[in-house]
């Protein structure tokens, strides 16, 4: 079994409060979980209202499949119209 983990740093330029950030982050987490069956957690920038650090994890029988699922999830985040910019992405596969 392999696990792919991706750490994303997001910028929310239109956001003006922690409450607004929480709404956007929760929406992204729920959409990713429902669509790709991945685990998503907010891991960084908890007190910054214009930055969010998310970690996305997927487990699969092969590293290639886990990596593909995570890559598709990241592409989906980039395609959402939530005024979110991906400013950093780091993916690693653990076999």
Spans of features found by a protein language model:
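Short beta-strand elements
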Residues: 36-43, 85-90
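Structural beta->alpha junctions
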Residues: 12-16, 59-62
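Cys/His-coordinated zinc-finger cores
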Residues: 32
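Short, charge-patterned binding micro-sites
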Residues: 3, 41-62, 93-95
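Short catalytic helix/loop segments, enriched in acidic residues and glycine
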Residues: 29
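Short glycine-/aliphatic-rich beta-strand segments at the starts of folded cytosolic domains
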Residues: 4-12, 18
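C-terminal structural segments of small proteins and small subunits
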Residues: 59-95
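C-terminal binding/interaction regions
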Residues: 21
């Amino acid at each position: 079994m392999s696990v792919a983990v991706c750490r994303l740093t997001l910028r929310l330029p239109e956001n003006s409060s922690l409450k607004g950030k929480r709404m956007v982050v929760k929406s992204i987490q729920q959409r990713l979980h429902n669509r790709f069956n991945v685990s998503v957690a907010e891991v960084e920038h908890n007190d910054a209202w214009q930055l969010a650090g998310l970690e996305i994890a997927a487990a699969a029988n092969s590293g290639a499949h886990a990596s593909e699922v995570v890559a598709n999830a990241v592409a989906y985040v980039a395609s959402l119209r939530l005024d979110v910019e991906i400013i950093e992405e780091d993916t690693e596969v653990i076999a």
